[in-house]
C-alpha cells in the first residue's frame, strides 16, 4: 500500500486517478481551505487521517510519502485572469509546496498548474520554480543548484486533456519530481486517439432549470451586430450567432442522432439569464475548457438552448458517475472547474515506478 498526500486537494482528482489505476493507497494527508470542496471530498473518500484547512499552518507529516500531489490556485497565472503572477498572494503558494517537498521528501511529487505559468514574468517565475525543485530538469543536470533546491530529478511538460481520451481542450503544465533513490528514468505518457466526443458525455434527461426560455432564444437568434443585452448585462461584442453547435433532431424527449457540426460563441445561460458568453463545442467534437463559473458552455438541443449540467462538467473532467456531491450547482461548477482531468493524472502516475 502506497502512502499519499496532497495540498490544494479540491474534490480529489488525485484520489480518483489512483482508484482508476486500481492502486492500493492510504491518504496520510490532504489539505483544502474551501469548506464545500472539503465536504465533497469527505463525501467521496472519507475523512483523511489529517485534513488541515490552511497550507500556512499545517504540520508536515513525519512519515515520508510515496506520492505528493499539489495544485496551487491557478488564477494568478491563468490566461483568463488578471495574471498578477507572484504579485498575487495565490501566486506564492508554490513555496508552501516546496517547503513540504524539502521536509517530507516524498518519493515522487506531481505539480499541476495552468499553461500561463510558463510565460509569467517572461518565463522567469517558472524557471525559478524549477530551480527550487530540480537538480536535473528534463534529464539535464543543473550545474549550480540553488541552496534552497529540493534536489529532485524534475520533468515538465504541457499536456492537453483532449490528447488523453477526454473531449475537453484543457492545457495544463505538469511537473513530476523523482527522488534520488527512486527510478528517475521518466517519460511523459504518449498521446491517445480521441474516440469520445462532447455529445457522448451529455445526460439523457436534463432538468428544465438548465434551459433558457423560448422567448429569450428568439431574442438571441434575432440579435446581430455589435452588442446586446440580457437583463441589462452586455454579453459580447460582434458575437456570431448560429444554431449549429451541438444539434439534435429532437426536443427534450427524444435522444437520437446527436451530432456536432460547428463551434462558436453563445450567451451563457445562467439560471438568472445573466452572464457573458460561453464557448461551445469545437469542430473536432471537443469542449472548450471547463471553468469555475456557474454559467458553463451552452449547447443547442433542437431549438432549445441550455447550459451544461454539473454532471456533464464532471464527466468532462473524467470523474465517474459514481462521484457524488450534495453542494449547490454553483459550488459543483466551481469544483469541477478547479479540478484536474482524472485520466491525464492517471496516465502520469502510471508512468511512475510505484
What name fits each language-model region?
Residues 1-4:
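Extreme N-terminal starter segment of soluble prokaryotic enzymes
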Residues 8-11:
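Class I SAM-dependent methyltransferase "Motif I" SAM/SAH-binding loop
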Residues 17-26, 44:
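A short, Lys/Arg-enriched amphipathic alpha-helix followed by its capping loop at the start of a domain
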Residues 27-32:
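Conserved SAM-binding motif I beta-strand of class I
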Residues 35-39:
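Short alpha-helix immediately C-terminal to the canonical SAM-binding loop
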Residues 47-54:
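Conserved SAM-binding strand-loop segment of SAM-dependent methyltransferases
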Residues 57-67, 74-282, 288-289, 305-306:
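Class I S-adenosyl-L-methionine
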Amino acid at each position: 500500500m502506497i502512502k499519499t498526500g496532497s495540498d490544494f486537494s479540491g474534490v480529489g482528482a488525485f484520489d480518483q486517478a489512483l482508484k482508476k489505476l486500481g492502486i492500493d493507497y492510504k491518504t496520510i494527508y490532504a489539505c483544502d481551505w474551501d469548506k464545500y470542496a472539503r465536504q465533497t471530498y469527505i463525501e467521496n473518500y472519507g475523512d483523511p487521517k489529517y485534513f488541515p484547512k490552511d497550507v500556512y499552518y499545517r504540520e508536515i507529516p513525519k512519515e515520508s510519502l510515496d506520492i505528493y500531489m499539489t495544485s496551487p490556485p491557478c488564477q494568478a497565472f491563468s490566461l483568463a485572469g488578471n495574471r498578477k503572477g507572484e504579485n498575487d498572494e495565490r501566486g506564492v503558494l508554490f513555496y508552501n509546496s516546496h517547503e513540504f517537498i524539502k521536509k517530507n521528501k516524498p518519493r515522487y511529487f506531481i505539480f499541476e498548474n495552468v499553461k500561463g505559468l510558463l510565460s509569467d514574468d517572461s518565463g522567469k517565475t517558472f524557471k525559478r520554480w524549477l530551480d527550487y525543485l530540480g537538480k536535473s530538469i528534463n534529464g539535464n543536470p543543473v550545474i549550480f543548484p540553488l541552496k534552497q533546491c529540493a534536489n529532485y530529478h524534475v520533468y515538465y511538460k504541457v499536456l492537453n486533456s483532449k490528447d488523453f481520451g477526454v473531449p475537453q481542450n484543457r492545457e495544463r503544465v505538469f511537473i513530476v519530481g523523482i527522488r534520488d533513490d527512486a527510478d528517475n528514468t521518466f517519460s511523459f505518457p504518449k498521446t491517445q486517439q480521441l474516440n469520445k466526443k462532447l455529445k457522448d458525455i451529455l445526460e439523457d434527461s436534463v432538468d428544465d432549470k438548465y434551459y433558457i426560455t423560448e422567448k429569450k432564444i428568439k431574442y438571441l437568434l434575432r440579435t446581430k451586430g455589435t452588442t446586446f443585452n440580457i437583463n441589462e448585462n452586455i454579453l459580447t461584442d460582434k458575437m456570431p450567432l448560429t444554431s449549429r453547435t451541438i444539434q439534435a433532431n429532437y426536443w427534450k424527449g427524444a435522444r437520437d442522432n446527436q451530432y456536432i457540426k460547428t463551434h462558436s460563441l453563445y450567451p451563457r445561460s445562467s439560471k438568472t439569464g445573466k452572464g457573458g458568453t460561453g464557448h461551445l463545442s469545437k469542430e473536432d467534437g471537443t469542449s472548450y475548457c471547463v471553468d469555475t463559473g456557474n454559467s458553463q458552455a451552452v449547447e443547442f438541443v433542437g431549438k432549445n438552448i441550455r447550459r451544461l449540467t454539473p454532471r456533464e462538467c464532471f464527466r468532462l473532467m473524467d470523474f465517474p458517475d459514481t462521484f457524488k456531491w450534495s453542494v449547490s450547482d454553483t459550488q459543483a461548477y466551481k469544483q469541477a472547474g478547479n479540478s484536474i482531468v482524472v485520466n491525464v493524472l492517471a496516465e502520469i502516475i502510471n508512468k511512475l515506478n510505484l
